[in-house]
């Protein structure tokens, strides 16, 4: 059953999609061209794993030197590439990390939204909006859509992954076809950028 939405006076646009579907481009466009406050789940997730944080200590306790940044003593930083190699290849470990990080991210959103309560519209950029059950933070959900082949191409070009690695990372998220019926607006990012900009501008 779909999660209930936010029904307060503030309009909260949740921007989601698949990996490399173009969420960041849409979120930044809304922020820069329409002067809307932008809250980014990826930034909150990265902040959760800074050196010395409780989440970082939990990760280091679980994986030890396998994810410890070489050459650092105290506080120890996490080698994010090493951690990614673990969680993208093991569903159980990925679920463990998500259960650790998602509540931290949700709390950061709560604090930020309270600070922005006077703003009429806020944009929330949340890649795992449905997976993390965060759609209840949003009054509107916009899904940035493209084909799986385009996701692969963009991941390979952006992150230097192999085709197998790109497909593996895409498979860790809900497929876009599963997310489309849950969205209020599907933004087609399979063609020229100008197309989705026109689509957004017509409703903002």
Curated annotation (Swiss-Prot):
Documented EC number(s): 2.7.1.24
MF annotations from Gene Ontology: ATP binding; dephospho-CoA kinase activity
Subcellular location: Cytoplasm
Chief localization: cytoplasm
Domain DPCK, residue spans: 12-204
Catalytic activity: 3'-dephospho-CoA + ATP = ADP + CoA + H(+)
Role, per record: Catalyzes the phosphorylation of the 3'-hydroxyl group of dephosphocoenzyme A to form coenzyme A.
Full protein name: Dephospho-CoA kinase
Organism expressing this protein natively: Prochlorococcus marinus (strain MIT 9313)
Lineage: Bacteria, Bacillati, Cyanobacteriota, Cyanophyceae, Synechococcales
Gene: coaE
């Amino acid at each position: 059953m779909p999660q209930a939405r936010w029904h307060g006076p503030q309009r909260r646009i949740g921007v989601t999609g698949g990996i490399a579907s173009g969420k960041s481009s849409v979120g930044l466009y809304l922020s820069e061209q329409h002067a809307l406050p932008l809250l980014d789940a990826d930034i909150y997730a990265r902040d959760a794993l800074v050196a010395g944080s409780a989440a970082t200590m939990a990760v280091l306790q679980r994986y030890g030197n396998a994810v410890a940044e070489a050459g650092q003593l105290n506080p120890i930083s996490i080698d994010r590439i090493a951690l990614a190699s673990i969680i993208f290849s093991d569903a159980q470990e990925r679920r463990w990390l998500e259960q650790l990080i998602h509540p931290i991210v949700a709390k950061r959103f709560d604090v930020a939204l309270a600070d922005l309560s006077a703003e009429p519209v806020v944009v929330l950029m949340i890649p795992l909006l449905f997976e993390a059950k965060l759609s209840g933070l949003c009054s509107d959900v916009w899904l940035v859509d493209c084909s799986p082949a385009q996701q692969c191409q963009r991941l390979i070009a952006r992150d230097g992954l192999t085709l197998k690695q790109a497909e593996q990372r895409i498979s860790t998220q809900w497929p876009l076809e599963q997310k489309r019926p849950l969205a209020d607006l599907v933004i087609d990012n399979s063609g020229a950028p100008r197309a989705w900009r026109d689509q957004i501008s017509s409703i903002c």
